[in-house]
Amino acid sequence: MFQVRIHGRGGQGVVTAAEMLSIAAFLEGKRAQAFPSFGSERTGAPVVAFCRIDDRPIRLREPVLSPDAIIIQDPTLLHQVDVFSGLSPDGYIVINTSRTFEELGLGEFIAGLRRERLCTVPATELALKHVGRAVPNAALLAGFAALSGRISLESVSAAIGEKFPAKVAAANVTAANVAYAWVLQQMQGVGRAETG
């Protein structure tokens, strides 16, 4: 079973991100489940959503405590909440920012992690440019798809199409395509740095 935990704030589409991820996995023939965990339910409050993906029926219903991947929609949570709790050294991390992990003050933390499983994506910037709103979820899911290979960009795009009206979906798919290419380019840089 592959488990994903998504951190963000109310109003950023955290729950929708988990739902779209589960739809994308389902479209690829997997079993999937998505659900949120709310603190105080207000715009701007920290929100966590979870997604599990497996080939077999999923019977677990509790929050994801040992994620295989973490998607962080709001980088201001990095030093306020233990967003990395339970992540294994083999885990994937996708953060919504144009800054590097070092610039975020995470250089020491990531030293024990696999660099090829870490990326940042300027998802809010992409959403503002292509969607006209600061909702980074579609771009981050595409970034996750590029980084992990667990789902395809085509499935992410189809899931976006299922969640949003046509015009909004098209704009989000554009942001997702740009984010996917962004992460692939970042990954090439990591590969060159490791072999160089």
Predicted regions, residues:
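Active-site cofactor/cluster-binding pocket
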Residues: 1-196
